A protein has these predicted regions:
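Non-catalytic terminal segments and appended small domains
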Residues: 1-207
Length: 207
């Protein structure tokens, strides 16, 4: 190992700068802190296509949810929000999003966000130019473990078909001071540990 590589490793391990991570730093956290892993052996992490200069591309998995019409005709945040059963994209092998339709999809990537790190998710430009918006709540807190549920909305006048492994979003990472309360511990962490696409659990917030 080169001296420069040793210095870089020590810097990342003990003196990580509080800044937006670049490709080399993201790769370091993946390889040394298991910050990102794949939940599907058919789709291992692919640095060549996914690792960008300051971000990491996210691919849709095989788990999908569509909202179901509430019996009252109103979505009430005090009550569990009704969704259709989670279904797999493995059969027929794709998902078609109709114009004006909103769906939830999981990512193939599972995250283990260390304390002192946060992620920001946003859509890819190539996807947005088709009229498909990624409406995800973009902050991924320190301590979060699990896949990300992406919220996709088709604003185009045409149906859009996606396949497992399609890169639809990207995540940026920035380092911060360590938190006293991380996601998953000592707080209402409703989505920690999620692997499949997960609907809203906002009713847990209402006391």
């Amino acid at each position: 190992m080169k001296l420069s590589d040793i210095i870089f490793h020590l810097k990342m391990k003990y003196f990580t700068p509080k800044t937006l991570l670049n490709d080399r730093e993201i790769a370091w956290f993946i390889e040394n802190e298991n910050m990102i892993e794949s939940i599907d052996e058919k789709f291992p992490l692919d640095y060549e296509s996914q690792l960008q200069p300051n971000s990491f591309d996210l691919r849709i998995g095989t788990s999908c949810i569509r909202l179901d019409a509430p019996s009252s005709g109103i979505i009430d945040v005090r009550k569990p929000i009704k969704t259709m059963p989670v279904y797999s994209l493995l059969d027929p092998g794709f998902v078609t999003i109709d114009p004006g339709e909103f769906i939830l999809l999981n990512t193939i990537e599972k995250f283990n966000i260390p304390n002192g790190m946060i992620g920001f998710v946003q859509g890819r430009s190539s996807i947005a130019r088709m009229g498909l918006q990624t409406e995800q709540a973009g902050l991924v807190d320190a301590g979060f473990q699990g896949t990300i549920t992406l919220e996709l909305y088709n604003e185009s006048p045409y149906p859009i078909r996606l396949y497992p492994g399609t890169r639809v979003a990207q995540i940026h990472f920035t380092t911060t001071n360590k938190s006293n309360r991380v996601y998953g511990k000592n707080m209402n962490s409703k989505y920690n540990g999620q692997i499949v696409a997960t609907g809203s659990r906002i009713h847990h917030d209402i006391k």
